[in-house]
């Protein structure tokens, strides 16, 4: 670019620049443009230091007071609620919504006592893993799924009913019935042994024996009979006897033992409600009832009993049987026992054993509501008689 002189004529290139009287050169700044005649310079000069270094101004450092702000709990709670709502909205949309999630928690004592694990450092230095902290990788044990056959086998085992596995049904020896006198039941008082243990005296300081003149008296012992010695030893043996659990015997064995022993024993025999036999004859009279008719006259109507009532009266019970022999007991070779009542056969089986005392008592009541009770004996065994359906069907077809 060529610059003009004060007269406005262009100067030759390389010529000397004219010096202005009012201008002063500043280091690092370009000279102001020459003043043209007829135009005044602007009051506010333009900032021509665009490419230069700005002048630094001093500003004092004021230390601000720090105020500890309390954590805002409400904001965090609101944020958590918003996040939960978003997660619920995400889970509720799309396929597979409502899937159960497994939350696995871990602690520092979950793996139990174990040796301290050591990890090698960069410079062959052992570092304890306890300082590092528990690992966040947890091995979740996968449960083995059962197959259809295994589940069916478990159901079969649960549905079994061919065994008794209830410890409460077993008879306890401590709950045995008490029978008087105690010699029959086996529970007797424990007698202390009268024989004293003779211990040798320890050797102590010698004492002077006192001389006492005692008259020497000798008693002649007579020899005892063997029967007396056996009687003396018998109660001691009976006192040490402890009753055992009742033995499970069949009906055939029980009847054989009763036939061989000389002692008499009472048996509890359970029979059906209706027994084969001739019911007692009763005069059936019709029931007369008086009914008032519309005309005001009394009419007598005869009513007969229903069929069910007549059948109930025609049944034979144990009270209707006559005294004496009722039936016969048959013991088969197989061990099966049957009771024959006329043409009807009843199967005889053992009843459930009771762990409490059962006694047969005869009660006699008088006219003045007073009476006597007599204990006839102790009942140990129970027999149940049930009808044999095979013989009933055979008799029906004939």
UniProtKB/Swiss-Prot annotation:
The modification N-acetylserine is found at residue 2. One of its GO terms (cellular component) is RNA polymerase III complex. Disulfide bonds: none annotated. The keyword Transmembrane helix does not apply. There is a cross-link at residues 68, 78, 141, 152, 160, 190, 199, 206, 220, 285, 302 (Glycyl lysine isopeptide (Lys-Gly) (interchain with G-Cter in SUMO2)). Residues 66-100 have a biased composition (Basic and acidic residues). It is found in: Nucleus. Component of the RNA polymerase III complex consisting of 17 subunits: a ten-subunit horseshoe-shaped catalytic core composed of POLR3A/RPC1, POLR3B/RPC2, POLR1C/RPAC1, POLR1D/RPAC2, POLR3K/RPC10, POLR2E/RPABC1, POLR2F/RPABC2, POLR2H/RPABC3, POLR2K/RPABC4 and POLR2L/RPABC5; a mobile stalk composed of two subunits POLR3H/RPC8 and CRCP/RPC9, protruding from the core and functioning primarily in transcription initiation; and additional subunits homologous to general transcription factors of the RNA polymerase II machinery, POLR3C/RPC3-POLR3F/RPC6-POLR3G/RPC7 heterotrimer required for transcription initiation and POLR3D/RPC4-POLR3E/RPC5 heterodimer involved in both transcription initiation and termination. DNA-dependent RNA polymerase catalyzes the transcription of DNA into RNA using the four ribonucleoside triphosphates as substrates. Specific peripheric component of RNA polymerase III (Pol III) which synthesizes small non-coding RNAs including 5S rRNA, snRNAs, tRNAs and miRNAs from at least 500 distinct genomic loci. Enables recruitment of Pol III at transcription initiation site and drives transcription initiation from both type 2 and type 3 DNA promoters. Required for efficient transcription termination and reinitiation. This is DNA-directed RNA polymerase III subunit RPC4. The gene is POLR3D.
